Amino acid sequence: MHGDQYPYDWATNPLRFLLPTWLHEGGVSATLERLADPYVRARIRQKIAEVGFNNFGQIDSWADIRIAISPRGAAEPGRTIEDIARERRCDPLDAVCDVIIADKGATRILVRSMSEADVRAIAADPSALVGSDGPCVAPYGITGQGKPHPRLYGTFPRLIGHYARDLGLLTLPQAIAKMTGAAAVALGLADRGLLAEGQAADVVLFDPTTIIDRSTYDDPHQYPAGIGTVIVNGTVVIDGGEHTGALPGRLLRRRGTVLA
């Protein structure tokens, strides 16, 4: 059995996913129409106050929910729901509903919903793999907008530099295995994850004494430190910390336990 994690205590989701599931029946348009109804908002307010309502996970405060991306400018990235409600002089739930409507349901948030103690315990667990749970991004163009989760830039350097090297929760080989060989085995990718004859030449050259994430919640669009060269399918794509322009990556599909 395997589990996986990203080494952060904040999660990310669409803002509307915090609301009761019945609101989403019929799609986004139906959700937005319902949220404009004061009676529906009253029902939501009652529901989220119930013991056991778990859409909010372990969220203790509206200050633990901050805007990550607001495609239509409904709210400023980095501001918390508590901030927005105070500035608009309204109830926090009304602020949530108003932002969702103005952004047509596309607002994404960061949510402090996990414990750092749990993050550390899972990082040290031999059965836990590591992944970013996010898309490829860059600090320019359309993906350089807003304040997305720092895991998009820093997941792997953070595990190596912070949790393995600085905190000593696991060894360097253990940390690397979680994101390479062990992950490839779990996913059934037969020719990936190891430095061996017959394996695809996917290689990252880094300095173990300096590698670290630099992406933060307030300033997420930051590349990590300590990585000099990246090779994908035998082609150098990062050289001296700069992209070469090469795009040798390809889609990997699993068929059973053998990569086709």
What are these regions (language model features)?
Residues 107-113, 119, 167-176, 184-221:
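Acidic, glycine-enriched loop/beta-strand segments at the rims
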Residues 93-97, 180-183, 248:
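Alpha-helical structural signal
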